[in-house]
Structures are given as structure tokens and as C-alpha cells.
Amino acid sequence: MKRQTRKAILAIFACTALAIDAGAGEQNRMTVSFNEKNVLQSITVGAATFATGGGDLWTAEFSDGTNRAKRVKACAHEAATCTRTETDAVLTLTWRDVPLGGERGVLDATVTIEKRPDGSQAWNLAFANRSPRWTLMTTAFPRLNRVTPDGAGDVLLPSNDHGAQIFRKRTVQPKPFRRAYLGYCPMIAGFFLGTDGLYFVPEDPEARIKNLLVEGEQNACYETTVENAGVPGRAAEGPRYPVVLAPLKGDWWSFARRYRAYALKQKWAARGPIKDIPDYPRRLCEIPLWINIHGYPDVASNILTRAKAIFPGFSTGLHWHLWQHSGHDVNYPEYFPAQPGTKECIAYCESMGQEPMPYVNGRLWSAPTSGFILAEPYAVLRQNDTRYVEKYGRLTAPLAVMCPTCAPWQKVVRTFTGRILDELGAKSIFIDQIGAAPGVPCYDPAHGHPLGGGAWWREGYEKMMEPIHRAWNAKGAFITTEGSGEMCLNMVDGYLQVVVRDPKDVPFHNAVYSGYTTYFCSPENNDDDPAAFRALQTRELLWGNALGWFLPDILDKPDKCAILNQLCAFRQKNLDALAYGNLLDELRFAEPVGKTTYEWLGRRPHHSLYDPAYKLPPSKFATLADVRGNWWRTADGKVVLLAANLTDREQRVVYRVYGTDKTAVLVLAPHELVRIKGA
């Protein structure tokens, strides 16, 4: 039965949530409080209190129906009246007569908060707009202010490649943290005070264009350009997806378990685990090492020949730029004719059991090419009626971002990828950016998709990639892309991860999607000292990544090659976990362990090989436990611990056995890697 609430602070939906696939004790309770003005007062989880900053729960931008550049802002606190109704399952907050660009009585806003059986809450926002002039463009919702006190909380935020980083005791930052969706980064944010945590994630099965914004005192919200933004009479009434808040107990792993339970039910994961996909090219997930080159066919064949001699026990993959007639980031998508000898190089390398993987770009068209005269209408159109153009480095010509919904562009990509498969005989291809670059709002009505935001970006890529993916897999060939964009999971077979590694990285994507795709590469400066090199590469190995994306001079470093031989051999013996299994947790110690600090030098790009004056970016310093390990569930359901001694000294540690209250002792010889059965 509905009831009108009184003007008093109201605690709603006090509930207990159980973590997904969690150990004993991973449960917590969440209480959310508002005042009589519908201002969020706090969110209490266990013994911790989050989001005490008050302020507007939502803001929105509206544009003039005849001029998208003319904007006004609507804010919750400006409403003439605020009301609230409650049932056992839903709380409804209403703001009536919100001023809009000088008009009154034309805008209402409604937030519904739905209690879910698992203890989470789904928050939705919708507007009723009666203005004849102003049309909804963007929303920022829900706005949680001062989620954790300055310097008090650990904050999990999205990052490139691995998917997330953990910021310990995060303080107020001078610059806003903003990440865009449909690219590298998942839309996630987690906040922890001790072992009490708050899960803050949009659940959007359609994968609409959106941003996460965190600024100031951990003030967080999700920004959305709505469908048909600024189109009078057609603009969406709001973001059209819920943001889910849930209580957590533990650390970022409890967050990842909850997200995995959601993510694996989405359309991009519908194919299921790769072990159960009949035409999944298992050759990809069983390649343990990759090299990155910019070189012609003779260079490519020589490098893979040397790699075969140095790493005889397994295949080496080659991320191959310059197989095409022109340079990198030049003359896209006019890749053909191929360099003389490309077809023969591919056949020769494949005959050795090596994997040459040509590079193409599935997103960009070089604007100076004559072909762009005809292609320009299919590029993304900005709000100011100019085409969206990017530039990569001062020597690179402008590159236009193509709208993935346009059939002519889809046909172009199908054509050049088909020629690489059929004419060159390649068994693998790297299609750059479709899994890394974020969705871009497009305002060209000729493209036929909703203007501005919406789900059309993913839908366009899916329509483009489905026949390409089917054709390649039918021949036992595989497709990869850059980054780790989850929305491409059913469009590609794996993700090449090229971003510089950081001590704050956590293996979020591996924890969520392990067993459902292949993540490969572990970029590192080849000049790192051997101990630092071993530490980073072992971390990546135990998280489930195949290793590599090294510059070819790695082959001139016997000490690094010896380390890689050892690590890759271990991976090949544990493919049931590292390629086909599920990453469960990290090795947790029952007694203190030694730690070592390593220097990871700044990235060396390929052109630094020929530029003695190249200046490295700053180093990063990582302090890691001397013994590392991760728990995995293998493809056949066994729980195992994979662990390594990073040091040249024997190590003895006492650790907690996953899923139990037991402890055990592990003694490791110098640089030893082991597999241990779980409980």
C-alpha cells in the first residue's frame, strides 16, 4: 500500500546482500537515507557511512530545439515541490515544476528506487518535459557526493586493459576522473571503508554511450547523452537504464564477483565459455607469447624464425604492422596492395607453427585520401555539424571516426578483412580500436540511428562484425581487437592489451570474463632489470594473460628470454586454468611476508629503436609480495592455486586456503612456480 511520507529523514530498504561465489562471511547490510527535500543524506553499509555530501541527486542539460549549442541546466534543488511515496518494494521521489530556461511549470523529474531480492537497489531517472522550446540532451545521475571522506577510502575505478585500478586512501584530486564507455573501460565504481563496500554500477544490457565522472571529494555520477538528444518531441525521457547500488563485504574481489554474475547474463557473453564454443579457435588462447613489430615481410619472417629458435617449445605470435603498402596510421582503409612477399611470409611463418597477425583499423578513415571524398558522409557528425576527426601524433594526418551503423562503411571493413583472409591466407587478424575507443555521439540524421546517444554504436559494430567473425572462424582463423571492451565479447575471439602496466592495476576483466575470452600481452620496457621484468611478467601470467607485445629486441636479451621460456612453459602446463578457467581470488597470507620494490621503466615505442635521443616517460615503482599467487577454477571445476617465488631466495609462507578457514604452508625454491590443489 502506498503512503505519503512525512517531512523527516527516512531510512529506506535496510537489507542484507549475499556476495556471489564468495567465501564465508561476505555479506553486508545497506541503508539509504533522504531528507524532506529528497536530498540524499547518507548510505550506510555495515559499520561504514558513504555519500554524506548531500547536493543534487540529478542534474540535466537541455538544448534549444533550434540550436543544440544553446544549453540550460536543470537541477534537483530548484524544484518547486518535492514529494515521496513508498511501498515495500519501491521508493518514488518526485520533483515538480523544475525551472527550465526561464520557463516554469514545464518540467518534472521522477526517481524510482527498486529493492531487489539480492539486497541491491536499482535507481532510475525519468523526466516529464512539457516545454515547447527546451529538449533533453544529457543527464548526470545518480549524483553521490563525498562518497568516501578525503584520504579515508579505497576506490575502485575503471582503467584501460585490465579494467580497473584500486586507489588506496584516495584523496581529493586536482582534475576530474572521467572515463567513457564502449571502449577500454567498464562502467564501474566501487568504494570501500575497511571491509565495508558500496557497489555503484549501471546495468545497461543495451550498452548505451555513457561516462563515469568522479571529481572533488569522491563525487560520483554517470553521465548520459540521451537517445535523440535535442530532437523536439523525440528525445528520450532519461538515461533508460538503472544504476545499481549494492552493499559489499570484503575488497574489490567481492565487487568483481557481483559484476561477473551480472555480466555473464548479457548478450555479449551469450556464446558461453570458450571451452564450449565448437568453432572457437583455441590456437589463440594457447599462444603464450607475442612480439610487436613495424616491419616489412622479410623483417617479419626473420623475427619469427629467430623466435622459433629461442622459444622452441611453443608458438610465438606477431602483431604485424606494415604488411600493407603504406605506413602506420596512413591511407586507412586503403591497405592493399600488400607489400611484396606478404602472402609468402604468412605461409612460411605458419608452416613453422608461428602466428603472423596483420594489423588493420576498424574505426578510422584517413581524411586526406581521395576515397574520403566519397566516405565523408558516413563519418560521425558532431553537434556543430563538423565530422569527428582525431590525430595521433604530430606527424600523422587527420583520421575521421566512421559511424559503425553506416552500411557502406561496414562493407568496406568486410571487404579488406575478407581479402586478408582469402587472398593472403592469414589465419588471424587484429582489428584495431573497435574494442578500445569509446562510443561517440553522432548527430547525422542520414545515418538512420537515434541522434546523440543510445545503443546504436554497439548495434552497428555487431552488424558489421557478425559476418566477418563467422567467415574467419569457419576457416579456423581468429579475430582480435585492442583493449578489453566487453561489448565486443561476441564479435572477436580475444583482446590484445597494449597499455603500460601500473602498480595500481587489478585483474578486473580477468576476474569477470576469464574463460569467456582470451586476454593477451603484458607490455614492458625490455630494458627493465631482470628482477623487475620477472615480477611484472609473473603478475600478468598468474592473472591469466598470455605474455608479450615486446619490441623485437627482446630476442637479443638472453636473460629475459630465459625468464619468458620458464613462464610460458608454466602457462602451457596450466591451460585448463589460465586459458579456460575462472580467476577466483588472490593468494592471501596468514602471516606477514617479505616485499620488494621494483622499478618499471617508462614505455619504449617502436620508433625508439631508431631514435637514440628518445626520452623515456617516468618510471613506475611497484612494491610486491615476494610470493605471488592466484586461485583458479579449472575448466573441469577443480580449484587450484598457481603461485610463484619472485625472488632468488627460498621463501616460506603461510596462506589461507580459498573457500575454507584453513591455513597451509608453502615453501618455494628461488624463482619456482607451482600448482597446488585447493580444498
What does each model-found stretch correspond to?
Residues M1-L10:
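Bacterial N-terminal signal peptides that target proteins for export
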Residues L10-A19:
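Bacterial N-terminal signal peptides
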Residues G25-G317, Y335, Y348, M352-E355, ...:
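Carbohydrate-recognition beta-sandwich/jelly-roll modules
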Residues E36-K37, T225, A236-P242, W457-T660, ...:
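Active-site-proximal substrate-binding groove within the catalytic cores of carbohydrate-active enzymes
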Residues C285-L381, K411-T415, W456-E466:
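Aromatic- and glycine-enriched glycan-recognition loops and surfaces
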Residues L318-H321, I431, T481, A643:
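Conserved beta-strand positions
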Residues P340-Y348, Q354-L424, R501-T517:
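Active-site-adjacent "subsite" loops/lids of carbohydrate-active enzymes
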Residues V401-M491:
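Active-site neighborhood of glycoside hydrolase catalytic domains
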